């Protein structure tokens, strides 16, 4: 009975690497497509937040900034979780990411979490002008941070993951 259990376990582990490469490659492709979509939304977010920051009394700008932020927020957490698992967990285990880059990514993620918490504290940008201005400035900072994130991931991080797949 133990021999059968070992054989079954061994067979499962033999097949896993055959599935791992297409699965990781698929995740990288999916993240790249999401980054393309996110890039467009980042631009919209920066423009609408800039408009709101310049004129905090502009109700239309405030509403548009909220709408763009909501469209990003809906999938941002799951996207970041997938990246964390793929890059920090799998990439770390397979030495795909240089130590200094890994530290940079973790620092970026901590800064992003703080900023997202700040945005969450004033998501109702219908308040007074100073609250709308703080909301707009937080969204501007988030758009800058997300643009840097997308550029780094598409140019450096995801290609490193793909190289690790085939080395």
Describe each PLM feature range.
Residues 2-167:
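Small-residue-biased structural context
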């Amino acid at each position: 009975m133990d021999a059968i259990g070992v054989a079954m376990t061994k067979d499962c582990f033999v097949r896993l690497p055959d599935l791992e490469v297409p699965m990781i490659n698929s995740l990288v492709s999916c993240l790249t497509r999401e980054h393309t979509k996110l890039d467009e939304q980042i631009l919209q977010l920066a423009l609408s937040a800039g408009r709101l920051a310049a004129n905090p009394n502009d109700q239309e700008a405030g509403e548009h900034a909220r709408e763009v932020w909501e469209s990003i927020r809906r999938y941002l957490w799951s996207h970041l979780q997938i990246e964390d698992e793929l890059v920090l967990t799998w990439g770390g285990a397979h030495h795909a990411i240089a130590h200094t880059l890994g530290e940079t990514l973790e620092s970026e993620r901590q800064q992003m979490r703080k900023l997202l918490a700040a945005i969450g504290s004033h998501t109702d940008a219908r308040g007074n002008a100073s609250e709308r201005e703080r909301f707009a400035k937080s969204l501007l900072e988030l758009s800058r941070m997300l643009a840097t994130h997308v550029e780094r991931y598409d140019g450096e991080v995801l290609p490193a993951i793909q190289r690790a797949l085939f080395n």
